[in-house]
C-alpha cells in the first residue's frame, strides 16, 4: 500500500467514513469520544436585589465577618415567592464556613449555614421544622413580598 493510500485510509477511518477502521476503531471518532453527558435540569435561581445602605437601623450594618474568615462581599438574595416562613436571606458563600442570614417577619436575623443554602440550591421550600428546632426565629407563613434590601456592607 502506498503511503498516500495509507494516510487516506487512516483519516477516513478516524473521521467515521465507513471502511476498515484504524487500530480497532471501526466507528471513527464516534467511538473515541464518549457521548455527551445529559445536563441537569435548571434550578430556579434566587433573585439578586440591589443593596441600599441609607438605613441606619438596618441590622447588618454593624455585622463583621468572623475573624480569620475569607469572606466575599455580602451577596443579597430575595427568596422566590413560593418559599414560606422567611422573607429574605443573605448568603455569604465564600466564608469559612458559609454563613446564611435569614429574616422572618418581626424577628431578628438568624445565622444558619445549612438550611437556606439547601433550599436555594434545590428550589424547595425552607424546612420549617429545622428552623423551629433552632428556636431563634418565629416560623410562620405570610404573603409579604421579599424585602427591598437585605444585607451586607457595600462592595468596594
UniProtKB/Swiss-Prot annotation:
Which pairs of positions does the record mark as disulfide bonds?
Answer: 71-95
User: Can you list the GO cellular component terms from the UniProt entry?
Assistant: host cell Golgi apparatus; host cell plasma membrane; membrane; viral envelope; virion membrane
Q: Which domain of life is it from?
A: Viruses
Stretches the record annotates as Interaction with gH: 21-141
GO BP annotations, alphabetical order: fusion of virus membrane with host plasma membrane; symbiont entry into host cell
Tell me, what does this protein do in biology? The heterodimer glycoprotein H-glycoprotein L is required for the fusion of viral and plasma membranes leading to virus entry into the host cell. Acts as a functional inhibitor of gH and maintains gH in an inhibited form. Upon binding to host integrins, gL dissociates from gH leading to activation of the viral fusion glycoproteins gB and gH.
What is the protein name stated in its UniProt record? Envelope glycoprotein L
Source species: Suid herpesvirus 1 (strain Kaplan) (SuHV-1)
